[in-house]
Amino acid sequence: MLEKLIERVLFATRWLLAPLCIAMSLVLVVLGYVFMKELWHMLSHLDTISETDLVLSALGLVDLLFMAGLVLMVLLASYESFVSKLDKVDASEITWLKHTDFNALKLKVSLSIVAISAIFLLKRYMSLEDVLSSIPKDTPLSHNPIFWQVVIHLVFVCSALLAAVTNNIAFSQNNKGH
């Protein structure tokens, strides 16, 4: 009897995630606002914007779009996995969600982080002259911000690759056992 009560209480605690999911949807609203603000800024300066600034603005929009997709993916998968199944009119709307387990979600998040990091590095590359001109010539490599950004990006890439390899090994071993 006590065991059943404890299990019911523990299972009911999954609903504590629901307000967090709702709060994360507000993050999407904020990202949408920032996206539209950046788009408006780009469009309102279209006749005076340089090609480099146009590319940087476009990369910024792509970055925001990736981030919004990442937030939405984690939000929906978390709700579906831990809180409750999503009841919807058209089941084809989010068929990918039914095939997204925790490991697949981890890989998608890892790859999204790598993509966001790559876009950030590309934006830095586009303004490389400005960054390098602000660094004294005799500055050691360990004090160069671009060096550390590349190192961090490589850590993200290695982490994503390691997660993919680990997931692949685990998946192939699970298939052999069944």
From Swiss-Prot:
Pfam families: UPF0114
Statement: the UniProt record of this protein carries the keyword Membrane: yes
Membrane listed as a keyword: yes
Compartmental location: Cell membrane
Membrane topology listed for this record: Multi-pass membrane protein
GO cellular component, as recorded: plasma membrane
Domain of life, per lineage: Bacteria
Keywords of this entry: Cell membrane, Membrane, Transmembrane, Transmembrane helix
Transmembrane segments: 15-35, 54-74, 102-122, 145-165
PANTHER family: UPF0114 PROTEIN YQHA
UniProt record similarity statement: Belongs to the UPF0114 family.
Protein name: UPF0114 protein HPSH_00970
Source organism per UniProt: Helicobacter pylori (strain Shi470)
